[in-house]
């Protein structure tokens, strides 16, 4: 009789384990399909996230415009309610009000009142699309990526190699996939969310947001079409150089000096195993899992996104306005180009003036840099410039305002130092590549 009871308990336990695994596999697969697998709909090969975004952009553009205005108005009211004798708060209200005027002028087709360069307006609109549509939609589905075992499974299989090469945990690999396959807007939110929930350390967060946010598959595809280079070959080169850059930068100042502590001490347990990886990952997931339902998690993620966008959108609009002014003052751009040219010339690279101009434009926007590329350059020159565009730039128009407005502990000085370190490493690699190419 006792043997029968034990047998029944064993069968029930194995049955429960099976259904637990199936649930994790199904939910993780849904997340992978939604975020990473391109599907062809109406002759457009995109992920489900972007198909939904484009549909809403075409069918509900007026609602989106109203939503953007609503975000800024909410942000202004929030500052007004918290107003005190602090002059910084008053300046923020003025800047956000000015951003609201700029946004309305863009919506009514009067953007030339504030912007001289049409490319900057196009880039700003594209970024607003990612912020106002893609990110909120992605946030609704993001629990499938972060809350149902995929983080633990990814960490189980990639933790050892990520630790050895980049000094980060294996869960960063999943975050990297969001950066490269979705966009850096969603990627930076995933980094923020992992850090806020006590799943990433301070140093890991800094390394992730500064080292893994530079590469984008969609940008690589556009770049290769522009310079007529085979995408897969160029992408392999990007990955190799990215690994070299990140390997070095994660081991030197300032990222090396970042604290290993968490934003707060949660009960989250990391996955670090050599055997039985899938079983260990599932066990860790059930130790870490939230008791919230899927709908509650989705709404919680959306609420966080809305709260972030309230301050982020007006800040980005104002930054684009300042960039527009700087970009159209010849003296400033020439001075910056001359300084960059001195640096590039020291490495004896060809067409140093062109490379310097591309590097500086890339600080503002990769699209500006791509548009400025000449079509009739030599293959090696295209290759070098393409590497600079693809990997050199930290997106200052997005990352700096996001980081400074969030709980992520990075100073502007640290961001600029990391950007300069990457520039030096890439320039040195291009120098070696060019001299090897010439020797052949």
Question: Where does each model-flagged region fall?
Answer:
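Interfacial loop-to-helix junctions that mark the boundaries of transmembrane helices
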Residues: 16-20, 49-64, 86-92, 120-129, ...
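Transmembrane helical segments that form the transport core of multi-pass membrane transport proteins
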Residues: 290-377
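Intrinsically disordered, low-complexity non-transmembrane regions of multi-pass membrane transporters
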Residues: 1-29, 85-86, 255-306
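Hydrophobic transmembrane alpha-helices that form the pore/transport pathway of multi-pass ion
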Residues: 1, 146-213, 371-380
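Hydrophobic alpha-helical transmembrane segments of multi-pass integral membrane proteins
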Residues: 134-147, 164-187, 341-373
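C-terminal transmembrane helix pair
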Residues: 26-31, 200-224, 228, 239-246, ...
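Transmembrane alpha-helix boundary signature
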Residues: 77-85, 104-119, 148
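Hydrophobic core segments of alpha-helical transmembrane domains in multi-pass membrane transport
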Residues: 25-40, 64-79, 96-110, 135-143, ...
């Amino acid at each position: 009789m006792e043997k029968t009871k034990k047998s029944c308990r064993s069968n029930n336990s194995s049955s429960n384990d099976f259904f637990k695994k199936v649930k994790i596999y199904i939910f993780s697969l849904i997340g992978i399909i939604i975020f990473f697998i391109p599907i062809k709909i109406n002759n457009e090969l995109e992920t489900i996230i972007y198909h939904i975004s484009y549909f809403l952009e075409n069918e509900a553009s007026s609602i989106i415009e109203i939503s953007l205005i609503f975000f800024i108005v909410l942000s202004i009211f929030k500052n007004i309610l918290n107003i005190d004798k602090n002059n910084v708060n008053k300046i923020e209200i003025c800047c956000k009000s000015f951003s609201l005027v700029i946004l309305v002028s863009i919506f009514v087709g009067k953007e030339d009142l504030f912007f001289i360069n049409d490319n900057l307006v196009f880039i700003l609109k594209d970024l607003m699309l990612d912020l106002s549509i893609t990110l909120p939609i992605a946030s609704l589905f993001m629990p499938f990526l972060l809350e149902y075992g995929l983080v633990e499974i990814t960490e189980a299989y990639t933790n050892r190699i990520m630790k050895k090469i980049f000094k980060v945990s294996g869960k960063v690999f999943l975050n990297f996939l969001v950066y490269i396959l979705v966009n850096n807007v969603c990627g930076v939110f995933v980094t923020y969310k992992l850090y806020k929930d006590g799943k990433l350390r301070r140093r890991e967060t800094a390394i992730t947001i500064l080292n893994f946010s530079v590469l984008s598959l969609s940008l690589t595809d556009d770049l290769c079409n522009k310079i007529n280079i085979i995408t897969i070959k160029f992408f392999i080169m990007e990955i190799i150089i990215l690994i070299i850059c990140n390997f070095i930068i994660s081991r030197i100042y300032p990222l090396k000096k970042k604290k290993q502590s968490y934003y707060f001490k949660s009960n989250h347990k990391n996955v670090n195993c050599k055997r039985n990886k899938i079983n260990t990952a599932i066990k860790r997931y059930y130790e870490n899992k939230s008791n919230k339902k899927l709908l509650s998690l989705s709404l919680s993620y959306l609420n966080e996104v809305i709260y972030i966008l309230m301050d982020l959108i007006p800040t980005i609009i104002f930054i684009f306005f300042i960039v527009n002014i700087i970009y159209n003052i010849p003296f400033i751009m020439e001075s910056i180009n001359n300084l960059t040219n001195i640096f590039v010339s020291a490495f004896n690279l060809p067409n140093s003036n062109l490379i310097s101009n591309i590097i500086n434009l890339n600080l503002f926007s990769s699209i500006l840099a791509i548009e400025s590329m000449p079509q009739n350059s030599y293959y090696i020159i295209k290759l070098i410039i393409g590497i600079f565009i693809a990997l050199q730039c930290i997106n200052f128009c997005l990352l700096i305002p996001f980081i400074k407005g969030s709980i992520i502990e990075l100073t502007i000085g640290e961001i600029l130092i990391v950007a300069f370190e990457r520039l030096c490493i890439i320039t040195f690699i291009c120098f070696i590549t060019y001299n090897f190419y010439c020797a052949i």
